[in-house]
Design a protein with these regions (language model features):
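Polytopic alpha-helical membrane proteins, predominantly small-molecule transporters/carriers
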Residues: 4, 12-324
Length: 324
């Protein structure tokens, strides 16, 4: 679960055929993350160690983008500028280049905690509810920034997006409530899936909060705070549980590589394909592939209402990602 933008810029724009290939590769990378988690949870690996190794990859990538730019050396003076610019920035003016360094830290630290929790709940969700439902709920997290944007900035969705939101809420209810047995409707309630939905959504929202007020120049520093904090929290939890097994650590590295390339290929695909095409296909196809792989490779069997919830999720993600 890396953010959708690293600050990559392709040296040249690929053709539409190449962009479509990049989109396919992004989908495959995103799908493989959930499937690797299924393997790690089936073998009961230490999820904190897996998460630590993943965020080591992410932190290393962020550091590579910061190398030689001198942003870290400017953090000390940036604190005072950040406090001076804060009132004006929150009124809609945004931060300047120096103040954005402080904003990167202010938003990046709590965002790192959300990213850590999102990865933990994704792994728990895969173990408790299967890879199909867990993958669906992690993708549904996009609804959280949409809802908060309505409340905070009055960004009203289109009629089509409202339809997608309604379908998404329906899928959440179907997955968590057994409507066929009203007396025990809440017996199927899964707090882990809801926590997965919320933490992934808040992690995505942190990106929007940074981008709304901060400068793109400091985006790499923001990512370093996000991944660095997630790494520190997960490393602390890993060290508390005892010996770290090499197989668990290598599995985490195996997650980190597709996690990185999912974002990389997604950005490359956007150079020739429209956003309104890329994101619905990316989200919906990933869920379909995860569900198919869950059934074929791991013999997961969803109940009828859970299958319907996955179908509604796919439809909802297509609709909410459609742009004006």
């Amino acid at each position: 679960m890396l953010v959708k933008e690293y600050g990559f810029h392709a040296s040249r724009n690929p053709s539409k055929g190449a962009s479509l290939l990049y989109l396919i590769l992004a989908v495959l990378c995103s799908t493989s993350i959930a499937l690797i988690f299924k393997v790690s949870e089936t073998r009961r690996m230490n999820r904190y160690v897996v998460t630590t190794a993943n965020y080591m990859v992410a932190t290393a990538v962020s550091l590579s983008f910061l190398a030689g730019r001198g942003l870290l050396n400017r953090l000390g003076p940036a604190a005072g500028v950040f406090l001076e610019e804060l009132p004006r920035a929150l009124r809609g003016g945004g931060f300047g280049p120096q103040g954005s360094l402080g904003w990167a830290a202010a938003v990046g630290v709590p965002a790192g905690v959300m990213y850590f929790l999102g990865f933990i709940y994704l792994q728990k969700g895969v173990r408790e509810s299967g890879v199909s439902l867990a993958g669906s709920f992690s993708k549904l997290g996009v609804l959280v920034p949409m809802a908060l944007s309505i409340l905070l900035w009055h960004e009203v969705p289109t009629a089509v997006q409202w339809t997608g939101i309604a379908l998404a809420l329906g899928s959440i209810l179907l997955a968590n409530l057994d409507v066929s047995h009203p007396r025990r409707a809440f017996a199927a309630f899964s707090p882990v899936l809801l926590l997965l939905f919320l933490t992934v959504g808040l992690a995505e929202f942190s990106n929007k909060v940074y981008q709304r007020y901060g400068s793109m120049e400091a985006k790499s520093l923001f990512l370093l705070f996000v991944f660095g904090v997630a790494l520190l929290v997960s490393l602390f939890k890993s060290l508390r549980v005892g010996r770290i097994r090499a197989s668990h650590f290598l599995t985490g590295l195996a997650v980190g590589v597709p996690n990185y390339f999912a974002s990389h290929f997604l950005i490359l695909s956007l150079s020739q394909l429209r956003t309104a095409v890329v994101f619905p296909i990316y989200s919906a196809t990933t869920i379909v592939l995860i569900s198919l792989a869950g059934g074929l490779l791991f013999e997961e069997r969803l109940r009828p209402r859970e299958r319907l919830a996955v179908v509604l999720t796919v439809a909802a993600l297509v609709l909410v990602n459609l742009q004006r």
